[in-house]
Amino acid sequence: STHMKLRTLLLAALCAFASAASAQDWAKPRLEKTTRHYEYVKVMNGTREVTAFITCPEVKTKATALVLLHDNQGLTDWARGMTDQGAEAGYITIAPDLLSGMGPKGGGTADFGGDRDAVSKGFAALGQKPDQITSDLDAIVAYVAKLPACNGKVVVGGFCWGGNQTFRFA
């Protein structure tokens, strides 16, 4: 259908953008220079702990939250830098590490040490757990919606693999 073709084209474009952008070294210096508050948080999903990176906008009113789903490289400096861009636009932006608990030592993306083959295997294993992804996202949405700075509105978006998960989660 036309809708499916458009969706596929959109995902391909986001993947291309994410791949090109992830090769850039702008993200880490951006976070080092930002005046916005950011931190890692742990969100519980039952007994499972999901690590997430959150950046808050510098606004005086309650803000809408953006759950930003990473690409197929995991929660990288690039994904963390994108949370700063979301906050700059006025959103409380949280990026969950959906590889939480999938790393060789039980950690998330950082546990893979930049080994792309290992990350790919982690994503292959994660792909077998769509219910886990959904419940992790439910927990992240519930967490961010209840923050005192949030107005209760939450939107979800993502890049490449994360874009696909966004469509699935909707």
Where are the regions that the model predicts?
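Bacterial N-terminal signal peptides that target proteins for export
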Residues: 2-10
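An N-terminal hydrophobic leader/cap segment in hydrolases
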Residues: 17-43, 50-53, 161
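Active-site signature of alpha/beta-hydrolase-fold catalytic machinery across serine-
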Residues: 81, 168-169
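Aromatic pocket-lining residues of Rossmann-like dinucleotide-binding sites
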Residues: 86, 169-170
